Amino acid sequence: MMRSLYSGVSGLQNHQTRMDVVGNNIANVNTIGFKKGRVNFQDMISQSISGASRPTDARGGTNPKQVGLGMNVASIDTIHTQGAFQSTQKASDLGVSGNGFFILKEGKNLFYTRAGAFDVDSDRHLVNPANGMRIQGWMARDLEGEKVINTASDIEDLIIPIGDKEGAKSTKNVTFACNLDKRLPLIQEGANPADIARGTWVVNKSLYDSFGNVSVLELRVVKDLNTPNLWNATVLINGEQNSNFTLGFDNEGALASLNGQPGQKGDILQIPITFNVLGANVGEVGEQQTVNLKLGTVGSYTDSITQFADSSSTKAIIQDGYGMGYMENYEIDQNGVIVGIYSNGIRRDLGKIALASFMNPGGLAKSGDTNFVETSNSGQVRIGETGLAGLGDIRSGVLEMANVDLAEQFTDMIVTQRGFQANAKTITTSDQLLQELVRLKN
């Protein structure tokens, strides 16, 4: 039999394989997180008719004579280039801008994917709803009253506790960073109510006790009649006078003294106020609560009460307490941190999504569901947080589309078709030659 017959057969078989890969790419053009394949060919071993000879004094050298025996598939590569993002506006839809993979777990087995169409199941786990695999990361833990995420610990299932309660927290500090208008008029003795109102800076702030009950702090500040740059302040709690103090400023509008005691530059001026809160039962007087009024830093303009010839402000006043609330929603930032949003306005870090990378992502094996698994040639998985070692950032509200270029695939399809036709022609022509040989006998 002629070698060209078998060369043509190998060409047909392997061009069919290439067509299978092209067809799979086109079929998955709209598959979220899909990575296209590419077929590379190589020639097979060649049969030597004669070897090479070296040159002599009388005659030059000759090259080897070899006849090829066809071709085969050298590799079928998975191309892990970045796909374009499609906006969905859904918080749990995620895409990776970089080289990282999301980590999924089923039982004890880990899978890796770029398809980030996730959701929260009835057990409040963050999962891939197509197969129920759970997304891996790190949950936040309570440490001295703060939520801390330890990314050095082992990865675990991520839980988003929609509907969970956040208990009330009593107010410990009220921080002021507002401005007192230096142009406010002095309030003379015997002034009428209108003049008193024009010359008084008043601000109200809600304070919380450990039950979530609200008390109203009212601060009234007026210019001192006798001393420039000095202001007299009165604190009222729930409409009842609580305490008094004075604030002094330097000639550049920065806070300088409290109750006549000048501070050094950088000193924090603060004053405690104490009042009774409601008890556990209706009408019962509870324990005393102390709240620290942080009035500012001596010599600072950014985190202190100031005195400038500009409108008095009331917005830059912050207190650290809150009432009871329920988790209503969540969002995921570009660092992969899941942030719970509560009905009382509090935001809590719930956990962080982990990403995986490999020395050779092309060595990963496809396992279905747009997932990959580790192989001996992918290298061991390296798990980390976003922004490290090329893992990239996480985008919320988007999905990564397939990296299939239809123009490229249609071109490959045409080239593959012509290659298949050419190899088929090799077989038919070889058959015609064999027929001629058979006819020689007749």
Curated annotation (Swiss-Prot):
Keyword Metal-binding belongs to the record: no
Annotated compartments: Bacterial flagellum basal body
Entry annotated with the keyword Zinc-finger: no
Gene3D superfamilies, sorted: Flagellar hook protein FlgE (2.60.98.20)
Alphabetically ordered keywords of this record: Bacterial flagellum
Gene Ontology cellular component terms for the protein in this record: bacterial-type flagellum basal body; bacterial-type flagellum hook; cytosol
GO BP annotations, alphabetical order: bacterial-type flagellum-dependent swarming motility
Pfam families, per database record: Flg_bb_rod, Flg_bbr_C, FlgE_D2, LlgE_F_G_D1
Cited InterPro entries: Falgellar_hook_FlgE_sf, Flag_bb_rod_N, Flagellar_basal_body_rod_CS, Flagellar_FlgE/F/G, Flg_bb/hook_C_dom, FlgE/F/G-like, FlgE_D2, LlgE_F_G-like_D1
Family of the protein in this entry: Belongs to the flagella basal body rod proteins family.
NCBIfam families, per database record: FlgEFG_subfam (TIGR03506), PRK05682.1-5 (NF004241)
Record's protein name: Flagellar hook protein FlgE
Organism expressing this protein natively: Borreliella burgdorferi (strain ATCC 35210 / DSM 4680 / CIP 102532 / B31) (Borrelia burgdorferi)
Gene encoding the protein: flgE
